[in-house]
UniProtKB/Swiss-Prot annotation:
<dbReference type="InterPro" id="IPR037143">
    <property type="entry name" value="4-PPantetheinyl_Trfase_dom_sf"/>
</dbReference>
<keyword id="KW-0444">Lipid biosynthesis</keyword>
<feature type="binding site">
    <location>
        <position position="8"/>
    </location>
    <ligand>
        <name>Mg(2+)</name>
    </ligand>
</feature>
<dbReference type="InterPro" id="IPR004568">
    <property type="entry name" value="Ppantetheine-prot_Trfase_dom"/>
</dbReference>
<dbReference type="InterPro" id="IPR008278">
    <property type="entry name" value="4-PPantetheinyl_Trfase_dom"/>
</dbReference>
<comment type="function">
    <text>Transfers the 4'-phosphopantetheine moiety from coenzyme A to a Ser of acyl-carrier-protein.</text>
</comment>
<dbReference type="Pfam" id="PF01648">
    <property type="entry name" value="ACPS"/>
</dbReference>
<keyword id="KW-0276">Fatty acid metabolism</keyword>
<dbReference type="GO" id="GO:0000287">
    <property type="term" value="F:magnesium ion binding"/>
</dbReference>
<protein>
    <recommendedName>
        <fullName>Holo-[acyl-carrier-protein] synthase</fullName>
        <ecNumber>2.7.8.7</ecNumber>
    </recommendedName>
</protein>
<keyword id="KW-0479">Metal-binding</keyword>
<keyword id="KW-0443">Lipid metabolism</keyword>
<comment type="similarity">
    <text>Belongs to the P-Pant transferase superfamily. AcpS family.</text>
</comment>
<keyword id="KW-0808">Transferase</keyword>
<dbReference type="GO" id="GO:0006633">
    <property type="term" value="P:fatty acid biosynthetic process"/>
</dbReference>
<dbReference type="GO" id="GO:0008897">
    <property type="term" value="F:holo-[acyl-carrier-protein] synthase activity"/>
</dbReference>
<dbReference type="GO" id="GO:0005737">
    <property type="term" value="C:cytoplasm"/>
</dbReference>
């Protein structure tokens, strides 16, 4: 059963402006170490890499119905790759707690994430599915 759906569109130029203005302070506040390492491996597309991940965080916050309130912070939501290479989310802190609150008893969550970009836009969709254990 689908328990959450969220999407977000992020302007890559806006992320580039934040990187230019705030540098590592912005990176460390918003992105996980795994996300920062991936961006460093893509020096010519760093803003696009970050913009897709920023959009994913926003999309997840919409899918759980909180936005960035009620203890859900951007760094609690990390984009990682499954063994297949597909993007998914690793949750900690308030994001993990909020997802657990949404799950019916006897269910576990699967998070489906898709990312795309076409300069100057990056887009993410998140679907949260509950499966009976």
């Amino acid at each position: 059963m689908i328990i959450g759906l969220g999407s977000d569109l992020c302007n890559i130029e806006r992320i580039q402006n934040s990187l230019d203005r705030f540098g590592e302070r912005f990176e460390n506040r918003v992105f996980t170490e795994i996300e920062r390492a991936k961006a460093r491996r893509r020096p010519f597309t760093i803003a696009g890499t970050y913009a897709k991940r920023f959009a994913a965080k926003e999309a997840f916050s919409k899918a759980v119905g909180t936005g960035f309130r009620r203890g859900v912070f951007m760094k609690d939501i990390g984009v990682v790759n499954a063994r297949s290479g597909a993007p998914t989310l690793a949750l900690t802190g308030g994001a993990a707690i909020r997802l657990a609150e949404l799950l019916p008893d006897g269910h576990e969550a699967s998070i489906h994430l898709t990312l795309t970009d076409d300069h100057p836009w990056a887009q993410a969709f998140v679907i949260i599915e509950a499966h009976r254990i």
